A protein has these predicted regions:
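Short, charged helix-capping/linker segments at alpha-helix termini
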Residues: 1-3, 15-24, 34-53, 182-184
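Sigma70-family region 2
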Residues: 15-16, 42-43, 53-70, 89-91
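Amphipathic, Lys/Arg- and hydrophobic-enriched alpha-helical face
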Residues: 26-44, 61, 126, 171, ...
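Hydrophobic-face residues of short alpha-helical interaction/recognition segments
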Residues: 33, 37, 62, 66, ...
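Structural recognition of an alpha-helix C-terminal capping motif at a helix-to-coil junction
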Residues: 49-56, 69-81
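Short, basic/polar amphipathic helix motif occurring as a linker/hinge flanking DNA-binding modules
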Residues: 86-106, 113, 183
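Acidic, proline/glycine-rich intrinsically disordered inter-domain spacer in sigma factors
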Residues: 101-127
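Helix-turn-helix DNA-binding module
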Residues: 124-127, 131-135, 139, 143-160, ...
Length: 184
């Protein structure tokens, strides 16, 4: 459990105009916001932009937040909407990002190449999933959210969350099994 005021208290203080309180909320939820935006968007820079736009929109709408409800789903719903809006606005890209590979010395070039290949395949497999499955995988596996929390955020029943997670993992497993067969 983190120390200091809880999210509801910080949101109340932010609604009263205390920008430092909102800054604490940003610090607490920035990682989750970026990861969820990344599940919707193809480019890391776009995900960062969407997360920032989501925080700005949340700051502007903080007085509409219901402190009886958890803060993170309210915020991430805004971030997802911002990511979807950004995706619609940026239908054509002229540049592509090149992810950095291993920077620290240690692994051999062959090991680094294998890790980069696996990372590329995993990113490609995630990108090939439907948006809702990507969001479910990110929230469940990367953020540790419960099925009910994810369902509440996305407006779907728990059983649908479980089903989406199952189908997403199966698709990822098939993609990665193909990679292992190629490497053997």
């Amino acid at each position: 459990m983190r120390g200091g005021p809880d999210d509801a208290e910080l949101a109340r203080r932010a609604a009263d105009g205390e920008s430092d309180a909102f800054g604490v909320l940003v610090d607490r939820h920035a990682g989750a916001a970026r990861r969820v935006a990344r599940a919707v968007l193809d480019h890391p820079q776009d995900a960062d932009d969407a997360a920032q736009e989501g925080f700005l929109a949340a700051w502007q709408a903080i007085d509409k937040y219901d402190p009886r409800q958890p803060f993170a789903p309210w915020l991430l719903r805004i971030v997802i909407n911002e990511a979807r809006d950004l995706r619609r606005r940026r239908t054509v890209r002229t540049t592509t990002s090149i992810p950095l590979s291993v920077e620290a010395p240690g692994p051999s070039p062959e090991t680094a190449t294998d890790a980069a290949l696996i990372g590329d395949r995993l990113r490609a497999a995630l990108a090939g999933l439907p948006e809702r499955q990507r969001v479910v995988v990110m929230l469940f596996d990367a953020e540790g959210w419960a099925h009910g929390e994810i369902g509440g955020l996305l407006g779907i029943p728990d059983g649908t969350v479980r089903s989406e997670l199952h189908h997403a993992r199966r698709a990822l497993r098939q993609t990665l099994e193909g990679l292992w067969k190629e490497r053997s």
